[in-house]
Design a protein with these regions (language model features):
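Extended, highly charged accessory segments
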Residues: 1-16, 22-25, 52-280
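Long, charged amphipathic helices and adjacent flexible linkers at domain junctions
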Residues: 24-30, 35-37
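Residues immediately within or flanking Cys/His clusters that coordinate Zn2+
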Residues: 3-6, 32-35, 42, 50-53
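Short solvent-exposed strand/turn elements
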Residues: 39-42, 80
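Zinc-coordinating Cys/His ligand positions in small cysteine/histidine-rich zinc-finger domains
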Residues: 46
Length: 280
């Protein structure tokens, strides 16, 4: 929520006033992070030069030749500063978040704790594999939809200012006139991490989910069934489509502070599992 609500140049409202997110508070030197991920599953590794030597925690396959690096200058989200402004136009309000795209990845520090069950019909047809991942580490990366500059946001690494397009044009002109001066502005992506219990669902061909729309429909139905069976609010459970668009998988995780424990029950308690499947 913080990544999108308090994203670069975003407009927020408080006590009837309009505020623009203008700066990120820096506590030290800005340090970039390297992320490698498996596009088939969404499993991610941070700051590991030899990520290709790892195996995927879902498929067990080697990441050699499979993993991809997330391009750009990735920095961790810190506290933001917003300035009140009365000159924000309706067009600016509508445009600000349209340029955001939030991507979700995951990993686990204890793969031995991952357990699996199978989603089956009453007659035993195998529909999907479900893995329960306790203390799953979720990584959210905020990018710009603008394909230029590695989908990053213009950021002054010395002051923490988010640089508007107008200021960037002036800055580039000055850089051309004085190339000897150091350039503190970089195009960055923001990330944040959290830990939550999660389940990872791999649909099989027998489910006949032929496109991403069908996958999202299945994801919504399964998530809604969990909410209904365990009587929890929709905001307490998050869900994302993960991995390859041709063979997408599903990640469902607990959003509430502290563990709800419902996803663990789903995998470990047959009665809870059957109730959710029947409801879905």
């Amino acid at each position: 929520l913080a990544l999108t609500e308090f994203g670069p140049q975003n407009i927020i409202y408080n006590d009837g006033g309009k505020f623009r997110v203008s700066r990120m508070m820096l506590t030290g030197e800005v340090t970039p992070n390297k992320f490698f991920y498996n596009p088939k599953t969404g499993v991610i590794y941070k700051n590991q030069e030899n990520a290709s030597h790892h195996t995927d925690i879902i498929t067990g396959e080697s990441l050699d030749g499979v993993s991809k690096m997330i391009p750009g200058y990735c920095i961790q989200l810190q506290d933001m500063v917003a300035q009140e402004s009365e000159k924000i136009t309706c067009q600016e309000e509508e445009r600000s978040r349209k340029f955001y795209q939030l991507k979700t990845y995951f990993s686990s520090d204890d793969t031995r704790a991952i357990s699996m069950c199978e989603l089956k019909t009453n007659n035993g047809t195998h529909l999907a594999n479900i893995r329960y991942i306790p203390s799953c580490r979720l990584t959210y990366i905020l990018e710009s939809k603008n394909d230029d500059n590695a989908n990053g946001f213009a950021f002054d690494t010395k002051t923490g200012d988010w640089i508007s397009a107008e200021r960037m044009a002036i800055h580039m002109q000055k850089q051309q006139q004085h190339p000897e001066e150091p350039n503190s502005i970089k195009y960055v992506k923001l990330f944040t991490e959290t830990t939550a219990n999660a389940i990872y669902i791999q649909p099989l061909d027998t489910l006949a989910l032929s496109d991403k729309g069908a996958v999202r429909t299945f994801l919504y139905a399964f998530k809604q069934a969990i909410e209904d069976v365990f009587q929890i609010e929709g905001s307490e459970i998050g869900a994302d489509v993960m991995g390859d668009e041709k063979v997408p998988n599903l990640l469902i995780y607990e959003n509430a502070e502290g563990s709800l424990g419902v996803l663990e029950r789903l995998v470990l308690e047959p009665a809870s599992y059957h109730a959710v499947v029947k409801r879905a």
